[in-house]
């Protein structure tokens, strides 16, 4: 007797999504890690440091999921060139006076987008 699998996406579509999630988590950990030395405010440095760890854990878990979906685990892929360009622009916030822009770009733009994508995936 066979049982239908739960979910609406094919294995390939799920692998692409997971690859996108991994890519963004990896980019976030690198971006936040790079900003720690550039950010003068100690509370913001500590926040970035904690979230570097969280992003690393998430990227690792997504990477472990990829082989289960018959996809290469060594790296993720951006969902689109436009989104990759947006993340590159955010990564470019390197000036010392851009701490507020850094916080807003990650916690009001990228993280909410990631949460919405995760919620859609689970629905």
What are these regions (language model features)?
Residues 27-50, 114-123:
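Helix-loop segments that flank and shape redox-cofactor active sites
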Residues 11-14, 25, 41, 48, ...:
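Generic structural signal for well-ordered secondary structure
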Residues 19-26, 53-60, 105-116:
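Generic structural signal for well-ordered, non-transmembrane alpha-helical segments
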Residues 2-19, 78-109:
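Acidic/His metal-coordination segments adjacent to aromatic residues that form catalytic metal sites
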Residues 19-27, 31, 41, 61-67:
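Intrinsic structural disorder
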Residues 46-90:
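Conserved alpha-helical segments that form or flank metal/cofactor-binding pockets of metalloenzymes
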Residues 33-37, 63, 70, 91-94, ...:
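A structural signal for long alpha-helical coiled-coils and helix-turn connectors
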């Amino acid at each position: 007797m066979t049982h239908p699998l739960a979910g609406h996406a094919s294995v390939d579509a799920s692998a692409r999504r997971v690859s996108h999630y991994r890519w963004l988590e990896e980019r976030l950990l690198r971006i936040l890690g790079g900003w720690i030395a550039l950010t003068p405010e100690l509370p913001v440095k500590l926040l970035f440091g904690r979230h570097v760890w969280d992003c690393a854990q998430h990227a690792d878990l997504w990477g472990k999921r990829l082989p289960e979906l018959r996809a290469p685990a060594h790296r993720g892929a951006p969902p689109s060139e436009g989104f990759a360009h947006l993340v590159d622009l955010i990564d470019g916030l390197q000036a010392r006076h851009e701490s507020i822009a850094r916080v807003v770009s990650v916690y009001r733009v990228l993280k909410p987008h990631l949460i919405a994508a995760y919620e859609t995936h689970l629905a």
